[in-house]
Amino acid sequence: TIALAVILVVLCSTVAILDGIWLGDHNDELGIIPFFRKYDYTSLQVGKYDWFGTGAQVAFTFMSGVIQFQVIIPIALFISMEVVRAGQAYFMVQDNHMFDDKSKARFQCRALNINEDLGQIKYVFSDKTGTLTENKMEFRCASVHGRDFSETDGGGEEDRIAVLVDGVVIRPKTSVKTDPKLTALLKDGTGAMAGRARDLFLALATCNTIVPIVEDTADPAAKLLEYQGESPDEQALVYAAAAYGHTLVERTSGHIVVDVFGTRQRFDVLGLHEFDSDRKRMSVIIGCPDKTVKLFVKGADSSMFGIIDKTLNPDVVQATEKHLHSYSSVGLRTLVIGVRELSQAEFQEWQMAYEKASTALLGRGNLLRSVAANIERNMRLLGASGIEDKLQEGVPEAIEKLRQAGIKVWVLTGDKQETAISIGYSCKLLTRDMTQIVINSNSRESCRKSLDDAISMVNKLRSLSTDSQSRVPLALIIDGNSLVYIFDTDREEKLFEVAIACDVVLCCRVAPLQKAGIVDLIKKRTSDMTLAIGDGANDVSMIQMADVGIGISGQEGRQAVMASDFAMGQFRFLVPLLLVHGHWNYQRMGYMILYNFYRNATFVFVLFWYVLYTGYTLTTAITEWSSVLYSVIYTAVPTVVVAILDKDLSRRTLLKYPQLYGAGQREENYNLRLFIFIMMDSIWQSIAVFFIPYLAYRNSAIDSASLGDLWTLAVVILVNIHLAMDVIRWTWVTHAAIWGSIVATWICVIVIDSIPTLPGFWAIYEVMGTGLFWALLLAVIVVGMIPHFAAKAIKEHFMPNDIQIAREMEKSQDSHDVSHPEVQMSTIDRA
């Protein structure tokens, strides 16, 4: 738009300056021109003109030129773009390849102004849980007082422990695979180990916000117990507790009822500190039937081991840490559970502090966190749990496709490092040939040293790589603590230098605001397009920070969806969204914008040539109605239709060759070089439109209105044929739009010239019946299209880009399919 404004100023300045020169050369003759004549024609007095001098007239001419040539600024383009985006959004929503069969949810387009950005994405920032994984947690193993219990049996429907309530058998709705040794220990065991095991599963049954719901079945004597809650992790842990004989059957704001192997026990809820991303743990204070008060705490190992009293059982702590490493190495999500028995004095002190903090008007959240920190200390380690969260269908293939498309995928997760690395290998984010750069620091100094070492490694590997084939792939793995030190000490530039040199970045144990900080790190320092995708409330800040935000409609509510630009059901839908629709949208929108520049510039240059041959008076032979209708009726509809329906490549080709996505990243369809080319093309075509009829009719008696009608028709036909030459896939709608607009132009010109009160009455009829008129139209089209046709042919045959090569392959494949139909049955190679 800035370039078009410059062209407008140049055109207006040229006309104004030439007008000033003309006025100076004809100063003595201005009296005979009605426009300047102040008095009647009986007295021709030199200098007595109705104007304020040459300077003022030049300024007036410049401003009039702005009004005359303002069509070059495509104001209507913004309306066309919104219509096109709405059409593109419709086809994205209706795409069955992005329909989630499990949730029966279609793709949602919540923002209509960034469709084309989907074709230029360079970085994808993804959450892990619920985004790459199903967020359907299954309890797999437990570490109890330093002993590993991970030998689960088949655990089917019949293995679910049932409880009897008022004569009705109630079974948990979900079964859990159990370890028979752990079950036996809980049922019949004695001693410290059995006590710790029972406390652990009591903690799992009580330290949560789960609500038990009893559902009816076909059998009146049997019912199902469903656990509902915000966190799938909590649901899995409560189902596990039920499978091991500790069934949560009732919860109110004041008490919890747990069935312990057939014995119902009531526990008073004396206090609850809910989970938050800063503490990374939650705790509950319960009053037990034996009148003791216990504090149960569960949370991430990075948070829990700081409050565990390691002097009580150092061997147990060491064994548990070993088990946690083993669990996370196979991709399990881990939690650590602790307990402490509170004295009455400790409880009363906590109760007073809690009541004061909870009723505070200012800083309530910080005060409650402080109260929690004071009570959550000197905990006795009970053990740990391992929960499996399976990958979503098609995630490894999707990440591989994105990598082939030149898109860098960064995973930002709250899981511990070993779990994140294991999932990274499972989803093909990490590969065995990658060199891993691990930054896992517990102090500012060690973090600084790790960053410096990482930069040295990157520079060394760069010097050893002579070409792209010999380049060693790099993966950066960094934890949340290191990010805290980096962001606090303004070492972001070094982190950026390391991160962009890596093919993969894996951030673990990161808080929600750190996720947004990572996205902002790239946005501030590059012009690359970023995309963030997540499913939970902790992903909202990241989604809002990225250029394009995508929400997964999953198990953790709709906060991410509500904050996003687009929403879908599965991570794998990102491939057709970006590689197919993103490519189409960018290609079509880029072409539409340049085409609008071209068609308006062609029309304006015709007006400009006319002004140069009419004494710079800024009159026009083209009627005002045609000037207005040019961008509204004559040429608008074909542009919009092509921008919605045209496809440069098929879906199959775009998915088979992800590298074609790079055209959008390199801005091949919208750049300064193409703008200059279309401006040169518009100048040439305007010369053909103006001068061929002008030279043919200059010695005839034809009036300017008839010539203006010829110019109008010639411009409209020329720009529509130009568009038709660039259409790749024709539909009946495309045919109707392009050829229909030409017919509509003819009808409008005839109707306008048939109204006696309008200028140019009957003008079209004066020339339309002559053979010269039709010959000139043909000549204008042929001469005007020669450069465009030649440039198109030369580019496609001698300088083809990847898109054109793929298009030729499609044509060859289509012709081969026609002669050999059996080829259509072969499997498409998507590797």
Would you name each region that the model predicts?
Residues 1-637, 732-748, 752-831:
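Conserved cytosolic headpiece of P-type ATPases
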Residues 23, 640-655:
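Membrane-water interface of transmembrane alpha-helices
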Residues 582, 659-671, 697-701, 721-734:
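Alpha-helical transmembrane segments
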Residues 606-610, 715-722:
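Hydrophobic, membrane-inserted alpha-helices
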Residues 614-621, 694-702:
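Helix-coil boundary and interhelical linker segments in multi-pass alpha-helical membrane proteins
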Residues 626, 661-684:
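Membrane-water interface at loop-to-transmembrane-helix junctions
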Residues 684-697:
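Alpha-helical transmembrane segments and their membrane-interface junctions
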Residues 702-714:
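Structural signature of hydrophobic alpha-helical transmembrane segments
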